[in-house]
Amino acid sequence: MNTKYSLPPASLLLVLTLSLLSLSSCRLSSSHLGFTKVDTARMPDCEALIVDFPIDVKVHVGERTAIVFDPEMPEQVRRELELRTDGRALLITSRREQTGFGRFLGRWSRKGAKAEVWVTSLHGLELGSSARAQLVDSITTPSLRLILSGASTLTGLRLSAGKFLFSSAGASVASGRVSVDEACQLELEGASSARFEGYADELKVELKGASSLKAPELQGRVVSAELSGASTAHIGTMEALSYALSGASRLSYRGRPVLGERSVTGASSVSAQ
């Protein structure tokens, strides 16, 4: 199957592209350079959290930055963990830089790692190294970036924002409810999956690999979807929709939106429910 359609006027993608220029899927911190060790009693007020350690964290927003470790957390695990900051973000990481198989083995010796974290505000959250985060409080912010990698997990998201970027890779899992007044961008790849509900004025979806987006209750005004590989996306109702599918990807949506540019190639498919 190889079909292409176009419908005047100009592509709906233009509106989304202009609105999403200020959003980027780059990591909040591509390395730990610029971060220095910090004591729990002397942490600055932070607006971002980076967890690069296999630990379960409960995240509170709206109070002075602090961290409290579970009293039952094994001492050997606590000794392996280190806190760093660049003055804006709090980084939870390992004292020893590990890669590859060494990092994989380290996960098995760090079971029982738990903590509660408080940040003054939250504009960015990055999870890696099989970290798991539960957002305890609802978040109201002009913009938010959530970046997941590895086999990390995010739950409890209740967001009200002007702009929202979500990027997920590896076997990461996320879920939440969002209300986005302007631009919302959801990027998934690898075997990652996400479940979202709520509303986004301008929604852009990009899926690769075997990633999956389950969002039948996520509504949008203008929606753009780009899927490849064996990815799947289920989206709710919208006013206008444009899409480009390749590989064996699948897209399903609700309602009867105005259709803009459409491209379907390979064994990919689109269905309206």
Please give the residue ranges for each predicted region.
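Bacterial N-terminal signal peptides
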Residues: 11-22
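Position-specific detector for the leucine-rich repeat
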Residues: 131, 152, 170-172, 192, ...
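Short, surface-exposed interaction patches in beta-rich subdomains
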Residues: 174-273
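Short, functionally important structural connectors and interaction interfaces within domains
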Residues: 13-15, 33, 131, 146, ...
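Acidic (Asp/Glu) and glycine-rich low-complexity loops/linkers
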Residues: 26-148, 157-168, 175-184, 258, ...
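Bacterial N-terminal signal peptides that target proteins for export
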Residues: 2-13
